[in-house]
Amino acid sequence: MTTKERIISLMRQRVLILDGAMGTMIQSYNLTEEDYRGERFKDLPGLQKGNNDLLVISRPDVIGDIHRRYLEAGADIIETNSFSSQRISMEDYGACDYCHELNVSAARLARKYADDFTAKNPEKPRFVAGSIGPTNKTCSLSPDVNNPALRNITFDELASAYKDQIKALIEGGVDILLIETIFDTLNAKAALFAAREAMDEMSVELPVMLSVTVADKAGRTLSGQTLEAFVASIDHAGVMSVGLNCSFGAKDMKPFLESLASFAPYYISVYPNAGLPDEMGKYRQTPKEMAVQVQEFVDEGLVNIIGGCCGTTDKFIAEYEGIIRHDGTFKTPHVPVKRDHNLWLSGLESKRLLPGSNFMNIGERCNVAGSRKFLRLIKEKKYEEALTIARKQVEDGAQVLDINFDDGLLDAKEEMIHFLNLLTSDPDIARVPLMIDSSKWDVVMAGLKCVQGKCIVNSISLKEGEEKFLSHARELRKIGAATVVMAFDEVGQATSFERKIEICERAYKLLTEKVHFPPEDIIFDPNVLSIATGMAEHDRYALDFIEATGWIRKNLPYAHVSGGVSNLSFSFRGNNYVRAALNAVFLYHAIGEGMDMGIVNPSTSVTYDDIDKDQLKIFDDAIMYTSPEASQKLIELADKLLEEQNAGGGKSLTSNHNVAADAWRAESVEKRLAYALRKGITDHIEEDIKEALEKYPKAVDIIEGPLMDAMNEVGVLFGAGKMFLPQVVKTARTMKAAVAILQPVIEAQKKGGEDSKSSLPEILIATVKGDVHDIGKNIVATVLSCNNFNVIDLGVMTPPEKIVDAAKKENPAIVALSGLITPSLEEMTKDTALKIASVYSGPVAWTKDASQAAIVAEKLINPRTSAAYISELNELYARLREEHEQKEKNPTEISLEEARKRKLNLF
């Protein structure tokens, strides 16, 4: 029995117990800088206190004691102390060269204690999970507000670092690979890719656990994915379990856990924080209180593995033994949802193709071979305009977007990476799955490594033989993508019904039997070819495709059928109505035989029912090849309609704009600006700002009025979980565009004496010493920059003296400090009142999220609002300090009614 089989066997019998927080336990030992360094790391530069992973070498007695305490508390699985032991995170400490040694040592240390406890009680075997953290960088978000296409880490760089870590953990003897605290699915996919490569190279097979952290009340990751989209994105990897950790306490985590357990075909884990931090930043929830909440998960059959994250200790874990049993018998663990055979794709949101689903439209216009406009925009580097084509397709109903840059005058790989990085930064577009379309394999792989969702690849074929076909399929299996399979082999392209089904059947068997490719991820394209070309041998092409579609759906279980629909009518290019009508008739018949997706123009307005009955018969006859004369009749009809169209009396296709979508343009200028900011639309920002300048005497009033009002609304929506992070960043970019237009006017008015206000001043920002995570800081810096603040970024792990020196040198108006990776909590305002504001003479403000940062900063430095806002803050902090003192003297609860009266209203 393999390790995975043993663990699964146990999970079917009972809920397993994972250990608790490592960092919280380490803090209780009050270690010094010298403890962290020891003899081994005495020459490392910079501060090392807080680099917990070093302790497996410098203080193995401490880490070993923590392992022992968790095992004595009843943990079935203990984690290695290796959360940050890859070179990306260790770079901030100057400790990259020690990564291999740290991981091997961490694994061996945990292995020793686990084996000792297993030997004492073989009936309760203990397992070691290699802890693999998310790193302090993200593949899916740009670190530069002015360049949304920029990334400070690539998939390949992440995968390489992860592979080195994973191989060292395996060498050290771990039983499980635990990829945890996932905030960016693309990072997780790189870790899974690395795990697969490491295990293949070392000829081992270990179970993999995944644990994701949600970043907002809507239950999305920091990079914007829903939980269902996240699971779709990693579904290829064959992991043992999927779960949640960090983020919230058990109570707030429950709705997300219920959702995950309802659809994920995996065993489920959960290890929440010990409630929410109090006003002093401490976790006050007791072990028994948390156990009561976690017991609900167990009693309701939601989980298979329970543990603890931030704030938990061995005392918390010790409570779990009592909640997984009832009258001495183990409670029934979660039973994973039965896996189906439906195609499951994802962008920021999930897309399933279920039996009976409507036809899946794949937008065709972001293809340089199919859209001359798109090609021109790409050649001219007008990427924002090119993105509007993608956005328009999504608005018009495209459920997947085809992306193709195969053109002799383009660097297809470079363009694919650049455009996808831009596209995935736009949540209105990135919510749908993508089809990575190229005849060049390096371009396909480069595209897949830019996207956190599960894509479709267009395409693979047997054209270069079985070996290359299977090699490509294995790569797709490893990275996680569905694929289009063209009806093309070593002989050539299939044109007849017989050749189409011959090639498709052969490809299906190779994929399912030799690669174990999921049949639901196979999408056959039996070649949509042009009809009515004037060549008789082409006249059956549509009918052969339709008949092949029916055969595939009946004989190749769970496989799908797609095609490039516009190819059918290519001989009528220039005659838009005929092309649209012919395509509509073709789709009507092909869908009836089982074609369930296709590359189409989603803006096309002609449907089967729109076509004149007499014309419809001609189109039908040509598609279904009812007679040898059918194609000629279609050609004659096309000529007639084109003549009428040219004379102005015929039907023609025009841009089918969604009138409702543009209704906001009729609103007042204030409402238009607010709408544009909420939606991140820059198309009309210049004309709206010019109109606003006619209404507002001072340009700065537009910033302080409608623009800041809109940003405030965005903050409210974000706080309520009705907007998510990528949308906020997009909003901030629109704000920046608006301010950029206003800035010259502000300067001119200043010189003319109309306004004494200068442009908004500098803000110094840093992540505090002991925290290597710069993602939250970068998001705040992005929003501040977009609101016309000049941001000076000191980076991560910033010592106090460096911050003070920089503040003296730069003389910024505001110093902004970041020190939390988990979502900000309202309790932190009490921390500000009690521990920070009381020791500073200047004003100190707390903001609950990035979207509020610019609003608070502007209030602080604006002479019109500063005094009142600072007074408001001081009154608030004084009240909070008084309440805290009273609570300490007399710790009694207040009524719900009184609590509601005292609710915080900072903004």
Residue spans for each PLM region:
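Domain-level signal for soluble alpha/beta catalytic cores
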Residues: 1-885, 907
